[in-house]
Amino acid sequence: MAERRLLLNPLVHNFNYYVRHLSSPGYLLCEVPDAVKQELQNSIDNLEKTPETDARGSLRGHLEEEWHLPITPNMSTFCEHLSGVYLEKFGLQPSMGLAETMRDMTLVEFNLERLWINYQKKYDFNPLHIHSGVFSFVIWVQIPYELEEERKRYKSNGDETAAFMFQYLNSIGGIDTEYLYLDKSFEWKMAFFPARLN
């Protein structure tokens, strides 16, 4: 077999180029600090399930139990801090809907305005959706199964059954998916992300 060689013409092949990656906004994955965990657990343990605390009328989830929780001091401070960390790591993204109106982020105060808990049971699900506001988050408090158990029960060509996912348009208009494969190791972990991220 003859060896094939690429002959480089210095007039055409001698040039500089730069690689530029295009990306969508990311997310922060963190462990919930003990002080925040204690406040949330206390709110959950003392939750009064009343028509006033029923959150189902204002949420997209197809769940039997969604309840408003009180906003506690440590939770509020933690979310405010994460807002700053997010902007430090990812910057202000135009897709977050703020770039046109908020040029100086040092003048902006982020406040946690709504907090709720979902008790997801068999057949309950959250459809693809976005949230209001600038940032949103999910904290997994209790996961009643191991990932391997889910994979055995729902055999398929993918792991979507046992996954939390973000879907977003990439820079060329395709749909990309980021999966978080949840198991007990995700208990008291938090994903913090732009509210418009599905």
Regions found by a protein language model. Name each.
Residues 113-192:
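Catalytic core of non-heme Fe(II) oxygenases with the double-stranded beta-helix
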Residues 2-108, 116, 120-126, 160:
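Non-heme Fe(II)/2-oxoglutarate
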